[in-house]
């Protein structure tokens, strides 16, 4: 085999071994973000740097510059960097790099972070416990409002009933008094009418006696009979409705004809 062919073969083998070594070394370093590379503004993010080997120091770089650095834990394979609350300055490309015995490893693949403007309260969804508590509170408040409304309506109805009853009682007292006064006046009028009627009857009877006394019969004269009729209409008009049986008898006697015999 010519010498130059051997030299070319050795160079190819060396280059292949070097490339394999670089690929294996790159696969040993990984970087990721929790919960994800897109973060709402104001939240927190955790960047995880992982390696299969053991190193003394781990560094987080942003676009080739040191961003954060810390000592590794013994036998630790994952190293976390907590960042937040985040803002727009966090946006960019990040890498992980490790150091052991003052020798730095190669950088990991790139991780791009993005910060979006979003309200934190809107981005966080409420949990089931919060939702159940809120629904229970709403139901309880609705029941309370219903009970209070019913009690208020009952109290209002009772108040109106008492008010109307009291008002009717006040209006009924004057009416009763007026009715009593009217009945008393009617009784007084009836009593006065009866007294006047008895006086009239007595006067008529006296005048009747006087007439009988003046018209005495004379002996030897012809017997003449004269009938005198009393004014019955004037007597009956002055009577009242409520007349006792005794007064009725007196009025009947006053309406009879008086016969006077004249000799």
Curated annotation (Swiss-Prot):
Top-rank lineage group of the source organism: Eukaryota
Family annotation (SUPFAM superfamilies): Immunoglobulin
Tissue specificity comment: Expressed in lymphoid and non-lymphoid organs.
Keyword Cell inner membrane attributed: no
Positions of modified residues (Phosphotyrosine): 227, 257
Motif (ITIM motif 2): 255-260
Post-translational modification: Phosphorylation at Tyr-227 and Tyr-257 activates it. May be phosphorylated by LCK.
Keyword tags: Disulfide bond, Glycoprotein, Immunoglobulin domain, Membrane, Phosphoprotein, Receptor, Signal, Transmembrane, Transmembrane helix
The protein's role, per its UniProt record: Functions as an inhibitory receptor that plays a constitutive negative regulatory role on cytolytic function of natural killer (NK) cells, B-cells and T-cells. Activation by Tyr phosphorylation results in recruitment and activation of the phosphatases PTPN6 and PTPN11. It also reduces the increase of intracellular calcium evoked by B-cell receptor ligation. May also play its inhibitory role independently of SH2-containing phosphatases. Modulates cytokine production in CD4+ T-cells, down-regulating IL2 and IFNG production while inducing secretion of transforming growth factor beta.
UniProt subunit comment: Interacts with SH2 domains of tyrosine-protein phosphatases PTPN6 and PTPN11. The interaction with PTPN6 is constitutive. Interacts with the SH2 domain of CSK. Binds with high affinity to extracellular matrix collagens, the interaction is functionally important.
Name by which UniProt lists this protein: Leukocyte-associated immunoglobulin-like receptor 1
Species whose genome carries this gene: Rattus norvegicus
Gene for this chain: Lair1
């Amino acid at each position: 085999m010519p010498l130059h062919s051997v030299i070319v073969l050795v160079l190819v083998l060396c280059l292949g071994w070097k490339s394999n070594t670089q690929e294996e070394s790159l696969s040993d370093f990984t970087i990721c973000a929790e919960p994800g590379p897109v973060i709402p503004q104001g939240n927190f993010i955790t960047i995880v740097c992982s390696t299969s080997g053991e190193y003394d120091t781990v560094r987080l770089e942003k676009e080739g510059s040191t961003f954060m650095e810390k000592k590794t834990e013994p036998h630790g394979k994952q190293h976390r960097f907590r960042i937040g609350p985040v803002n727009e300055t966090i946006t960019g490309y990040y890498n992980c790099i490790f150091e052991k015995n003052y020798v730095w490893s190669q950088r990991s693949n790139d991780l791009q972070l993005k910060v979006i403007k979003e309200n934190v309260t809107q981005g966080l969804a409420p949990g089931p416990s919060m939702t159940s508590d809120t629904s229970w509170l709403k139901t309880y408040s609705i029941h309370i409002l219903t009970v209070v409304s019913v009690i208020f309506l009952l109290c209002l109805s009772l108040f109106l009933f008492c008010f109307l009853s009291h008002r009717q009682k006040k209006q009924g007292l004057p009416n009763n008094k007026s009715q009593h006064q009217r009945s008393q006046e009617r009784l007084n009028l009836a009593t006065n009418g009866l007294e006047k009627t008895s006086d009239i009857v007595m006067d008529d009877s006296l005048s009747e006696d006087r007439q009988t006394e003046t018209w005495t019969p004379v002996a030897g004269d012809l017997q003449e009979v004269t009938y005198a009729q009393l004014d019955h209409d004037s007597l009956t008009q002055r009577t009242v409705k409520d007349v006792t049986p005794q007064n009725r008898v007196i009025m009947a006697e006053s309406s009879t004809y008086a016969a006077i015999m004249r000799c």
